[in-house]
Amino acid sequence: MGSAFLTAVEAPMHENAKQAVLKAQDIDIVSCGECTGEPSWQIRNKLADELLKIEAENPRDVAAKLLMEASRGSLAAASRDGDLDVGAVMTGQVCGLITEIKTVRNLVVDLCNDTEELLRKSYTLAL
């Protein structure tokens, strides 16, 4: 759900980052930062490739320090400045299912409607 709310009309996210989430598929998402103990999913880009290389080529403690240095300011670069090369666009693997920018209201209404439909279907299966 977080990824959907990132792309909401009201979200304070640069339009470039929102469009990157809409274009991304599940295979475009990588997990970075395991060496820090705080891994995160993000869209593969120049920064993500650099972070993955750091993690692959260094001992965990060294990689953690290098990764923190390499990623400093990267969230702001993507979300505020719209720089998709050096910015971290953090989104989950579900981003492939996000196909349009909606208002928060519409996201919540859709969630409620979808949940109601699933509950109705699961109830009839149980009979």
Positions of the model-derived regions?
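Conserved active-site-proximal phosphate/metal-binding subdomains
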Residues: M1-L127
